[in-house]
């Protein structure tokens, strides 16, 4: 068993150290795998455009939240039940 393991290891080492990795395939198929730098830059630049907004959009409920914070009753209710419910109970307006 020990000799079989040693032979397998030596065969694997010989395979790794052989010059098969330096061989290049011949034919037109080998050129299709690579692209020029200009084509590669076009692909990279195209993907960067769709990253999204650089800053987050403003919260639409921020003015409502500020108005509710100024009223102590609304502020207390918003802590217990949530902003929408508290604003509706105090001001009677649906957000």
UniProtKB/Swiss-Prot annotation:
Matching SUPFAM superfamilies: GLA-domain
GO cellular component: extracellular region; extracellular space
Binding-site residues, Ca(2+) 3: 62
Record-linked PROSITE patterns: GLA_1, GLA_2
Propeptide residue range(s): 24-49
Positions bound to Ca(2+) 2: 66, 69
Keywords carried by this UniProt record: Biomineralization, Calcium, Cleavage on pair of basic residues, Disulfide bond, Gamma-carboxyglutamic acid, Hormone, Metal-binding, Secreted, Signal
Span of domain Gla: 46-92
Residue sites binding Ca(2+) 1 per the record: 69, 75
Signal peptide: 1-23
Residues annotated as transmembrane: none
Superkingdom in the source lineage: Eukaryota
Listed GO biological process terms: biomineral tissue development; bone development; brain development; cellular response to insulin stimulus; cognition; glucose homeostasis; learning or memory; lipid catabolic process
Post-translational modification: Gamma-carboxyglutamate residues are formed by vitamin K dependent carboxylation by GGCX. These residues are essential for the binding of calcium. Carboxylated in a Ptprv/Esp-dependent process. Decarboxylation promotes the hormone activity.
Disulphides: 68-74
Subcellular location: Secreted
GO MF annotation list: calcium ion binding; hormone activity; hydroxyapatite binding; structural constituent of bone
Knockout-associated phenotype: Mice lacking Bglap and Bglap2 show increased bone formation, characterized by higher bone mass and bones of improved functional quality. Mice lacking Bglap and Bglap2 also display reduced male fertility due to decreased testosterone production in the testes. Mice lacking Bglap and Bglap2 are passive and show greater anxiety-like behaviors due to impaired synthesis of neurotransmitters.
Coiled coil spans: none
Stated role: The carboxylated form is one of the main organic components of the bone matrix, which constitutes 1-2% of the total bone protein: it acts as a negative regulator of bone formation and is required to limit bone formation without impairing bone resorption or mineralization. The carboxylated form binds strongly to apatite and calcium. The uncarboxylated form acts as a hormone secreted by osteoblasts, which regulates different cellular processes, such as energy metabolism, male fertility and brain development. Regulates of energy metabolism by acting as a hormone favoring pancreatic beta-cell proliferation, insulin secretion and sensitivity and energy expenditure.
Family listed: Belongs to the osteocalcin/matrix Gla protein family.
Name of the molecule in the record: Osteocalcin-2
């Amino acid at each position: 068993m020990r000799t079989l393991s040693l032979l397998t290891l030596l065969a694997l080492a010989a395979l790794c150290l052989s010059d098969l990795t330096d061989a290049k395939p011949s034919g037109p198929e080998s050129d299709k795998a690579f692209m020029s730098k200009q084509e590669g830059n076009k692909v990279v630049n195209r993907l960067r455009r769709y990253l999204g907004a650089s800053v987050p959009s403003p919260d639409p409920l921020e003015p409502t939240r500020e108005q509710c914070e100024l009223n102590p009753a609304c502020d207390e209710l918003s802590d217990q039940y949530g902003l929408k419910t508290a604003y509706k109970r105090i001001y009677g307006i649906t957000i």
